[in-house]
């Protein structure tokens, strides 16, 4: 089978016939460094039909999709001073605050896949609390995201990845639920292994407790 939107539509239809639901993953905090918007790996630089990436030229239409800390003309081509998620240069952080176009594009994606003909049943949101450069913008964005999704499909689930206390996002106007590693995975790991996450040290007081 060759991957295509048509095949995906068929997959969702068959799942729904069987009483199953499908949630897709949304990574909206960052993209890959190979993404055509940045093109750090120069995959699209010489390919036909693509705009120049923001890593390659300051004149890229995607320039404001990323926050560059060095902006002199002589920093290009190859400006690696962009924000990366947790400093990872292979995961360039998206710069919504400086690009209304980017925000509108992503909100369009949010709406598209839960609408006909795709009819997906919800979103799982990667590192959702990290999106944006401020807590204020983060909440503003997810309220817009929820509005876009629920207007298109009121039954669609919005499930976000979160570490810690997610209560501020669960007030009925942003996310529906969370994958909470600190509140679930961590204690289950203690109970089953007697070890903390990312640790090789066994502790009797954790096992079975």
Placement of each model-derived feature along the sequence:
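Aromatic- and acidic-residue-enriched carbohydrate-binding clefts of CAZyme catalytic domains
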Residues: 1-10, 42-95
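The substrate-binding groove and active-site-proximal loops of carbohydrate-active enzymes
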Residues: 1-5, 87-103, 126-137, 193-194
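Aromatic- and glycine-enriched glycan-recognition loops and surfaces
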Residues: 1-21, 100-105, 137-147, 156
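Active-site-proximal helices and loops of the catalytic beta/alpha 8
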Residues: 16, 29-30, 35-72, 109, ...
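Active-site-adjacent bridging/hinge elements
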Residues: 80-84, 117-119, 209
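Short, acidic/polar
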Residues: 99-116
